[in-house]
């Protein structure tokens, strides 16, 4: 077999494709010859970290992925979970970190576009989006530009496409100065018996290209996303894709219409590594070969090479295996929606991935070795050292508790995110019941009288850095807790694991321990991982990001009329804390923002207590007994109470005199498995008796009423003063009002 090879394959070319010398040797051994330039590009795309998960696969296999409601776990475009009545929720989260740092608007926009395609490729109509964003320190010269671009990109794409953004996170830390994180989540609803998968079945079937035309944008994007950054970062701008949400909306409608005709055998969106990855995955999963004819690919640029067509990451494109007799019907649907429809290949029985271009064979490779048999590493890893305990009596108490609380609610990381989410359409589709700013976003299930879904995304990177195992557990527990705080039953989760360079044993150790913690928490809480994404090499000039294993979860509310909000308390309600008194100040935001310290261990997560306390809180909400509920997380009890008071516009009078421990630990400690409930006075005693009977720790805190948050003689702050501090930081920062705002 002779394949013309016009570009010499040099060690420099191999290295620039992200392939190590031993990986290139493996290619030579596999195919018995030197690869063509196109084949080198194909191997580079399929064997990079972004597509093959070669450093993480071993550990991802340890995660719990099955459960009574799980219809489809990891391995497809998105996870699928049963929500009763013949419906299912389809969801996934994935990163677009590297592109968003280089070109923030398009990087973030195409991150949203890619995750929406993952959902509707499965046959689901998207109903909700979230995004978890991490930026560098506020006074870094690039941060404001990146925040502005990313938020505009997320909003520009999601709003135009027509999906409500119902939640997310925005955090700042110097460790993200050279490597921001954009983790995009989407969920959709489908019929449980009409899920579409990517596994091709049958020989001699047409492989069809759908959607927008192919250009040169994003060539090599997946390879870039598997590398560390250095000073040459600006040169990587051409590897960022450009998105068009209106084309994507047409693609959604055309795909869902086509799926109803019975024409679709397999379907895969073109994401990372474009045509290469989608074709290889469809063939390899179905134990079939694929023959592609690139001359039939719709292009929007002239003289595109086979290499460029195979690796382009142009957006809004799909690949499908079709029932041959339905070809004309399918084509008519796509033409109606103004989209390209082209038969670009066939399935074969030879397990080869063959690519033809201008009459020449430019690639002929073993498809299984590109796909599910790509290299896999068991990288050396080192356990993180344990931090010494930090008793509360060794941590300075604030001179003025009220000032300390104002400082926290008005800080870069605890202040209101209204500036961000008001740029997103949170209400489109008309089903949003809870908007950003609470514990979880809640969306009605269209067509059902009482059913709704709750969504949350969580991780506390400073905890993961201090103790990756406990930090991994805590990310899962907080997500589960936020969903529970609405009254929803947490069903399943998706993970987006963002770490530095896995070739460094200490970074690989963070990853391994965090995955172990995530797995333990998911098992204890019956919260399986059904989809996800790993983003490694998040380093610039050798400085790694904080380890950030984001967990996004979905919960089911059978009757949304009984759900809890954080701001729905009534005057005269009693305030009760479920869980233990605050005692843990290690890694707390009080320590970080008030005392400028990062000492101590992360809080331990008692998963038995999480389960017991959460199940109790959920039952109280579902019985219609709670008027409001909020989980206690960063900032401890004081910040949770302040957020509830600001959300409801009603004051709280709190008495901590029976609390055991130091006052600053009671108020700012970040112990886990805790909630604040407000209950009508005549119900509160009954709930407390039930808690006692169930072995659930609780503390009566006080009463709702007035216009101030009053905690004994320690804090007395008018709600308006809290709101002024809470709401002003973000707009002041973005408008550059007094650079002091950025340096807080």
From Swiss-Prot:
Q: Lyase: is it a keyword of this entry?
A: no
Q: What class of enzyme is it?
A: ligase
* Protein's organism: Rhizobium johnstonii (strain DSM 114642 / LMG 32736 / 3841) (Rhizobium leguminosarum bv. viciae)
Reported EC number(s) for this entry are 6.3.5.3
Which SUPFAM superfamilies has this protein been placed in? PurM C-terminal domain-like, PurM N-terminal domain-like
Q: What is this protein called?
A: Phosphoribosylformylglycinamidine synthase subunit PurL
- Sites binding substrate sit at 95-98, 117, 241, 313-315, 535
One GO biological process term: 'de novo' IMP biosynthetic process
In which residues is Mg(2+) 2 bound? 118, 269
């Amino acid at each position: 077999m002779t394949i013309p090879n016009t570009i010499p394959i040099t060690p420099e070319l191999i290295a620039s494709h992200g392939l190590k010398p031993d990986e290139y040797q493996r290619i030579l051994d596999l195919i018995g010859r030197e690869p063509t330039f196109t084949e080198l590009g194909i191997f580079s795309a399929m064997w990079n970290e972004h597509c093959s998960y070669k450093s993480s696969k071993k550990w991802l296999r340890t995660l719990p992925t099955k459960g009574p409601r799980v219809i489809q776990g990891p391995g497809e475009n998105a996870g699928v979970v049963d929500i009763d009545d013949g419906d299912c929720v389809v969801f996934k989260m994935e990163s677009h970190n590297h592109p968003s740092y280089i070109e923030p608007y398009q990087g973030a926009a195409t991150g949203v576009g890619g995750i929406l395609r993952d959902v509707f490729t499965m046959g689901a109509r998207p109903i909700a989006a979230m995004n978890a964003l991490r930026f560098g320190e506020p006074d870094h010269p690039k941060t404001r530009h990146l925040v502005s671009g990313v938020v505009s990109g997320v909003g520009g794409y999601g709003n135009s496409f027509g999906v409500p953004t119902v939640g997310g996170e925005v955090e700042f830390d110097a460790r993200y100065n050279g490597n921001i994180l954009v983790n995009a989540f989407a969920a959709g609803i489908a019929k449980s018996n009409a899920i579409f998968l990517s596994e091709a079945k049958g020989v001699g079937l047409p492989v069809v290209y759908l959607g927008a035309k192919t250009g040169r944008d994003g060539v090599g994007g997946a390879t870039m996303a598997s590398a560390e950054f250095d000073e040459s970062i600006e040169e990587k701008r051409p590897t960022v894709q450009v998105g068009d949400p209106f084309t994507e909306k047409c693609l959604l409608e055309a795909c869902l219409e086509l799926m109803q005709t019975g024409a679709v055998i397999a379907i895969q969106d073109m994401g990372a590594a474009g045509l290469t990855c989608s074709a290889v995955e469809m063939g390899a999963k179905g134990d079939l070969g694929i023959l592609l004819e690139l001359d039939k690919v719709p292009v929007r640029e002239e003289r595109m090479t086979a290499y460029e067509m195979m690796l382009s990451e142009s957006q809004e494109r799909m690949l499908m295996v079709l029932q041959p007799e339905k070809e004309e019907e399918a084509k008519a649907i796509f033409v109606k929606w103004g989209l390209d429809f082209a038969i670009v290949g066939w399935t074969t029985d030879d397990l080869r991935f063959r690519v033809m271009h201008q009459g020449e064979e430019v690639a002929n490779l073993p498809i299984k070795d590109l796909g599910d048999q790509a290299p896999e590493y068991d990288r050396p890893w080192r356990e993180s050292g344990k931090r010494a305990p930090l008793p509360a009596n060794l941590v300075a108490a604030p001179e003025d508790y009220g000032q300390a609380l104002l400082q926290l609610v008005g800080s870069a990381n605890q202040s209101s995110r209204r500036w961000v989410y008001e740029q997103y359409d949170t209400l489109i589709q008309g089903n949003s019941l809870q908007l950003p700013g609470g514990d979880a976003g809640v969306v009605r299930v269209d067509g059902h009288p009482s059913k709704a879904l709750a969504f949350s995304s969580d991780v506390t990177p400073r905890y993961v850095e201090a103790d990756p195992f406990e930090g991994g557990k805590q990310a899962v527990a907080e997500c589960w807790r936020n969903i529970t705080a609405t009254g929803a039953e947490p069903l399943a989760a998706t993970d987006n694991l963002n770490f530095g360079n896995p070739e460094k044993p200490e970074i690989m150790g963070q990853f391994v321990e965090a995955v172990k913690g995530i797995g333990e928490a998911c098992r204890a809480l019956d919260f399986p991982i059904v989809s996800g994404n790993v983003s490694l090499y998040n380093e610039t000039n050798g400085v790694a990001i904080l380890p950030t294993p984001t967990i996004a979860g979905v919960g089911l509310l059978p009757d949304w009329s009984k759900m809890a909000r954080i701001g729905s308390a009534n005057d005269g309600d009693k305030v009760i804390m479920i869980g233990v008194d605050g005692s843990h100040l290690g890694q707390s935001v009080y320590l970080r923002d008030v005392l400028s310290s990062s000492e101590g261990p992360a809080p331990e997560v008692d998963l038995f207590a999480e389960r017991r306390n959460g199940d109790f809180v959920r039952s109280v909400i579902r019985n219609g007994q709670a008027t409001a509920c909020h989980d206690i997380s960063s900032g401890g009890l004081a910040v949770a109470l302040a957020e509830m008071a600001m959300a409801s516009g009603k004051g709280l009078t709190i008495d901590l005199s029976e609390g055991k421990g130091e006052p600053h630990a009671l108020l700012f400690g970040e112990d886990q498995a805790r909630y604040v409930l407000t209950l009508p006075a005549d119900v509160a005693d009954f709930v407390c008796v039930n808690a006692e009977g169930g072995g659930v720790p609780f503390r009566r805190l006080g009463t709702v009423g007035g216009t101030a948050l009053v905690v004994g003689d320690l804090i007395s702050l008018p709600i308006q003063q809290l709101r002024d501090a809470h709401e002003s930081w973000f707009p002041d920062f973005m408008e550059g009002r007094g650079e002091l705002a950025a340096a807080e």
